[in-house]
């Protein structure tokens, strides 16, 4: 069971958590928000979830994978810190704001032997249906 940490407290992470739980391979462990009340409100539907307002403390906790769904401008810095903390990282789209940021994250992920990927859901797009129909 992978211990999951969430950065971001909008509706999107709730949907991600539902999907992650359906796999039977993830357990929500912790949530990070810049505001403790926001974090606590987000955690209400879940049992025994740790809430953090300090990103370093969050990343120092016992997590295997971090899902980042914060404001886009924060994705790069938060992902970089998570990788340096040796956490696998899933970043909501758009993952970063420039190709150079993505290249840096990929390099760091390789060096720290963690997985990194963008949470793109292409299968929901019309173009993907055309490909599916073709196959």
Where are these regions (language model features)?
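Short active-site oxyanion
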Residues: 27-30, 64-66, 116
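Structured beta->alpha junctions
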Residues: 8, 35, 71, 94, ...
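Short, well-ordered coil/turn segments that N-cap beta-strands
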Residues: 26, 87, 113-115
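Hydrophobic residues in well-ordered beta-strands that form the structural core
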Residues: 13, 91-92, 116-118
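Beta-loop-alpha module in the N-terminal Rossmann-like domain of NAD(P)-dependent dehydrogenases
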Residues: 46-108
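A contiguous active-site-proximal alpha/beta segment in oxidoreductase catalytic domains
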Residues: 96-135
């Amino acid at each position: 069971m992978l211990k999951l940490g969430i950065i971001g407290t909008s509706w999107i992470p709730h949907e991600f958590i539902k999907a992650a739980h359906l796999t039977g391979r993830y357990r929500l462990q912790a949530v990070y928000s810049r505001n403790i009340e926001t974090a606590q409100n987000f955690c209400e539907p879940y049992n025994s979830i740790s809430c953090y307002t300090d990103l370093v403390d969050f990343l120092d906790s016992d997590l295997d994978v971090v899902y980042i769904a914060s404001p886009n401008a924060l994705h790069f810095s938060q992902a970089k810190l998570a990788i340096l903390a040796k956490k696998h990282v899933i970043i909501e789209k758009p993952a970063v704001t420039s190709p150079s940021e993505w290249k840096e994250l990929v390099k760091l992920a390789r060096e720290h032997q963690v997985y990194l990927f963008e949470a793109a859901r292409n299968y929901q797009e019309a173009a993907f249906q055309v490909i599916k129909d073709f196959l």
